[in-house]
Amino acid sequence: MENNRDKKTDDILEKLVHINRITKVVKGGRRFGFSALVVVGNQAGRIGIAHAKAKQVPDAIKKANEMARRKLIHIPLREGRTIHHDVKAKDGSGRIVLRSASKGTGIIAGGPVRAVCEVLGVKDIVAKSMGTSNAHNVIRATIKALKKQNSPKQISSIRNKKISEIVEKRG
């Protein structure tokens, strides 16, 4: 399943989501470059995203990978395989709905959302992205949605209840 664009080094999986050719108009004409959008993660609840520009594609990818590694954040996962509850988020015109799924469902998501789920370590999830197909907005909306979810531990501290009372009521 991994191809030459997906590299795994020191337990961090790097996935290239999008490459774009960019143009800067200067006095003498046009200067061409490339931008790369990358997601990295340890497949155990840590993820980072970055966007970088350079004159050559490999340089842009390398730069984005280094930036993403510096911006790793932790996302709580349920049983290490799915999210705790259904969440919705929006970024720009990109809207995303993430739904927790039962064991064995797999990753039912398209494009950029699938890359995020794979590097995060989510094995069972159903996702629907609406609005734009712009990879940047879809990924930012996905990260927003993942940050919005609350683990049973967080909910129990907010409600002043035991974790066992919260987990019992879950479907």
Regions picked out by a protein language model, each given a short descriptive name:
Residues 1-171:
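Ribosome-associated RNA-binding proteins
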